Swiss-Prot record:
Belongs to the UPF0735 family. This is UPF0735 ACT domain-containing protein Dred_1164. NCBIfam families: PRK04435.1 (NF003361). The lineage of its organism: Bacteria, Bacillati, Bacillota, Clostridia, Eubacteriales. HAMAP family: UPF0735.
Amino acid sequence: MAKREPKYFLVQEDILPEAILKTVMAKDLLLKGAANTVNEAVEKVDLSRSAFYKYKDKVFPFHQWSRGKIVTLALLMEHQPGVLSTVLNIIASVKGSILTINQNLPLQDMANATLSVETAEMNQDLEELLRIIGEVEGVREVRLVGQN
């Protein structure tokens, strides 16, 4: 029987089983140097070593998974000067590389734009970038709609 290609899903943290969440926590302790060994990390988060090894290569925080990818963002913005420019400057300030911009004509004082952004050199994780963009005055909505 041929080996199937893995499928990937983006899921909210609150629906994940405890063992998977603790695996992410243990990996984070190792990454940050708060634990020197796998034994130490799994003890700190109260996880068995077998569960850690079962999941460690299959679960990643979203910001690690999205690093080095091309992501597509959809924006809904109020039609006022400087909103898109502010968003572009924010992306540039975190070393995101904007590959494409597609902006539609405003309808009823609202404008849609779609941005493709290369994340390889970004010094900010994607979740935080989306939060910052969402706080820009005039941005009504920002969504991650795709990745390559």
